[in-house]
């Protein structure tokens, strides 16, 4: 088996001319499979079937290998077997159709409601930068905008009288969103100052030069506000996640949250139900008299 593996690696080096880094990756991954196969008493690559390979992958996953690493390992294994099939050294590919175990989806980070209010309720100086930053923070949290949507927002899409904003989201889809009272007030305080910069176009959020703020500039302003008010780094999407989580927590209306976020598939929105459950579980742990009851199920030493 080792001779076949070495021949494949030489094929990658001399004929495919892969980089040394890529070649080392193939070697490490395939040596893991070889070690497991030899430990199982297999004497050639034909003896490795899909069931055995799945068992090997599961074992590596239990040992702490990430899904990404295992996907790369399976890709290397498929490459080996395709080579062996072409060379007539093997009759099947046990990795065909096999996929790596999926990692649990990471929950988005959010602020709890009190922290969100702490961020937004700080004292605001009456100057260009402070008023602008307050308006964009309020709008992020009030309407759940994506960073790209806030960057691309023009005055003509803002209706403060009706408390509405239109944005162009993913897939060039336009949606209309409510603007809360606090966000309206922040925008009303910002827009008169905006004209001082002689804006080049209709962008709602601009710098002192009059140019539309870039995504990077907005990320920096949000991060600085987080450090100043909360002592932590924030990202614009964290405010969007907080908007969704708090709205779902209060309303329980998943479909409405989906529409407001502009998600094409409700499955994307369902991640926030896990956040909501975490909140409910936390409330239960803090408030229920028997939530943290000590002792075993049979009552310990009770008669």
From Swiss-Prot:
It is found in: Cytoplasm. GO terms for molecular function: DNA binding; tyrosine-based site-specific recombinase activity. One of its GO terms (cellular component) is Holliday junction resolvase complex. Disruption phenotype: Defects affect induction of pyoverdin and related outer membrane proteins. Keywords: Cell cycle, Cell division, Chromosome partition, Cytoplasm, DNA integration, DNA recombination, DNA-binding. The active site is at 146, 170, 237, 240, 263, 272 (o-(3'-phospho-dna)-tyrosine intermediate). Pfam families: Phage_int_SAM_1, Phage_integrase. Its main location: cytoplasm. Gene3D superfamilies: 1.10.150.130, Intergrase catalytic core. Residues 106-285 form the Tyr recombinase domain. InterPro entries: CB, DNA_brk_join_enz, Integrase-like_cat_sf, Integrase_catalytic, Integrase_recombinase_N, Integrase_SAM-like_N, Recomb_XerC, Tyrosine_recombinase_XerC/XerD. Residues 1-85 form the Core-binding (CB) domain. One of its GO terms (biological process) is cellular response to zinc ion. PANTHER family: PHAGE INTEGRASE-RELATED (PTHR30349), TYROSINE RECOMBINASE XERC (PTHR30349:SF81). Forms a cyclic heterotetrameric complex composed of two molecules of XerC and two molecules of XerD. Belongs to the 'phage' integrase family. XerC subfamily. Site-specific tyrosine recombinase, which acts by catalyzing the cutting and rejoining of the recombining DNA molecules. The XerC-XerD complex is essential to convert dimers of the bacterial chromosome into monomers to permit their segregation at cell division. It also contributes to the segregational stability of plasmids. This is Tyrosine recombinase XerC. The lineage of its organism: Bacteria, Pseudomonadati, Pseudomonadota, Gammaproteobacteria, Pseudomonadales. The gene is xerC.
């Amino acid at each position: 088996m080792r001779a076949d593996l070495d021949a494949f690696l030489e094929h990658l080096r001399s004929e495919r001319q892969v980089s040394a880094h890529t070649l080392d990756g193939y070697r490490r991954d395939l040596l893991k499979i070889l070690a497991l196969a030899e430990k199982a008493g297999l004497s050639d690559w034909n003896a490795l079937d899909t069931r055995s390979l799945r068992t090997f992958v599961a074992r590596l996953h239990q040992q702490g290998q990430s899904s990404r690493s295992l996907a790369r390992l399976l890709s290397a294994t498929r490459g080996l077997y395709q080579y062996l099939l072409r060379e007539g050294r093997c009759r099947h590919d046990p990795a065909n159709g096999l996929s790596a175990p999926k990692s649990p989806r990471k929950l988005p980070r959010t602020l709890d409601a009190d922290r969100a209010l702490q961020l937004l309720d700080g004292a605001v100086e009456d100057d260009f930068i402070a008023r602008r930053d307050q308006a964009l923070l309020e709008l992020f949290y009030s309407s759940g905008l994506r960073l790209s949507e806030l960057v691309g927002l023009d005055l003509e899409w803002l209706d403060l009288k009706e408390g509405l904003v239109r944005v162009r989201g993913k897939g060039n889809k336009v949606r209309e969103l409510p603007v809360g009272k606090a966000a309206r007030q922040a925008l009303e305080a910002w827009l008169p100052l905006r004209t001082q910069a002689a804006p080049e176009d209709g962008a709602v959020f601009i710098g002192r030069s009059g140019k539309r703020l870039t995504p990077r500039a907005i990320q920096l302003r949000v991060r600085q506000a987080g450090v100043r008010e909360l002592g932590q780094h924030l990202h614009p999407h964290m405010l969007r996640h907080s908007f969704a989580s708090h709205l779902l927590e209060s309303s329980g209306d998943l479909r409405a949250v989906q529409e407001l976020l502009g998600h094409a598939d409700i499955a994307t929105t369902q991640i926030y139900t896990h956040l909501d459950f975490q909140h409910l579980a936390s409330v239960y742990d803090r408030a229920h008299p028997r939530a943290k009851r000590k002792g075993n199920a049979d009552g310990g030493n009770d008669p």
